[in-house]
Amino acid sequence: MASITQGKNESTLLKKVWDIANVLAAAGVGFTDYITQLTYILFLKMDSEKEELGLGSAIHEGYKWEDLVELNGTDLVDKYEEILKELSKDTGLIGTIFTKASNKIDRPVMLAKVIEMVNGENWYMMDGDFKGAIYESILEKNGQDKKSGAGQYFTPRALIKAIVDVVDPKITETVADPA
């Protein structure tokens, strides 16, 4: 299967990711929460795209991307919170990803704007290197903006926990983050 960027170059999509960050910043969402909320929203969107390709869905009916995109106002916020709560109860990988998930975008107009912006792209079929470039850009911008670690990248604790839960290393094994 060929990867796509829907005719858009990397800088255009990186700009879109930062436009989303600006929307969330205007809603009072901090950088760490931005990363978390963007991850949840992109996961829901990519699961939907995967299902459209006939590859199945990891998410139960009633808690999918499609259940969000048609809503607005407090109904949208309520549904997003319901989805996060329900997915956190899953006993598999989904539950690990959404452990203690909570909504940090409490303004309906801001949540609707983020969903609209994410919905305008096909994220699932993007090349893995491209997705990595987006992640690196986010980390780099955080290092510049917060002067956190002078540009060094730190793996968030929630990500470390999720990796350990999924890999399930034995007491004598090591999991490395070579970056």
How should each PLM-predicted stretch be described?
Residues 1-171:
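Non-catalytic, mostly N-terminal accessory regions of nucleic-acid modification and defense proteins
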Residues 170-179:
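Conserved class I S-adenosyl-L-methionine
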